[in-house]
Amino acid sequence: MSRRKQPDSPLFPLQAPVPDFTFERAAHRDGFWPVAGADEAGRGPLAGPVVAAAVILDPDAIPAGLNDSKLLTAEQREALFEEILATSTVSIASSSSARIDTTDILKASLDAMRRAVHGLELAARIVLVDGRDVPPGLSCHAKAIVKGDSRSVSIAAASIVAKVTRDRMMARADATFPLYGFAHHAGYATVKHRTAIESHGPCSLHRMSFRPFRQV
């Protein structure tokens, strides 16, 4: 009797990992407390700042539903943003498009994260950072965590704060630069945004070091 071949992949897709408090607990066991999470929003857009946030969660008041901001709806992000601000220690910093053009997007992002961490009213003993790079010049210990916004609740909270803050900034910028539709795409390279750039040229919020502006 022949055996049925096992499928190469599971019958049901695996769920995306949900961030938890594992990294924070490990840091606490190692003697590092408080623990902050840090993340940024806006590395990829053609326009606007990159915004970083640092968050120290209250272990007794962690908002339900924390996750990578990219996996949440705008309504979910807004609700969690308000809850995070009400229950946590939060600091926000940004690097402008001019700063991005003067240095580069990675340096500008890391500098914004450093300033966000240093702006916390409660000094962190260690900061968990999303990605592979740790901001230079931190006054505390740091640990880089790849895909940290889907693994650590502190980083997930920071990703939400950074994303909502930046989206609100770009919505306000739409009133000053109404030709580009910043309220709809937040500066990302959508077809509508590229068409507006072709029609009207770049504005002062555009990152001239990014394509397609290098030849403009």
Swiss-Prot record:
- Residue stretches making up the RNase H type-2 domain: 33-216
The chemistry this enzyme catalyses reads: Endonucleolytic cleavage to 5'-phosphomonoester
Cofactor binding description: Manganese or magnesium. Binds 1 divalent metal ion per monomer in the absence of substrate. May bind a second metal ion after substrate binding.
Q: Which UniProt keywords apply?
A: Cytoplasm, Endonuclease, Hydrolase, Manganese, Metal-binding, Nuclease
Q: Which PROSITE patterns match?
A: RNASE_H_2
Q: Which cofactor does it need?
A: Mn(2+); Mg(2+)
Check the record and name the InterPro entries matching this protein: RNase_HII (IPR022898), RNase_HII/HIII (IPR001352), RNase_HII/HIII_dom (IPR024567), RNaseH-like_sf (IPR012337), RNaseH_sf (IPR036397)
Which BP terms does GO give this entry? Answer: DNA replication, removal of RNA primer; mismatch repair
The family database entries (NCBIfam families) matched by this protein are listed as: PRK00015.1-3
State the family it belongs to. Belongs to the RNase HII family.
Main function = Endonuclease that specifically degrades the RNA of RNA-DNA hybrids.
Q: What is this protein called?
A: Ribonuclease HII
Lineage start: Bacteria, Pseudomonadati, Pseudomonadota, Alphaproteobacteria, Hyphomicrobiales
The UniProt gene name for this protein comes to rnhB
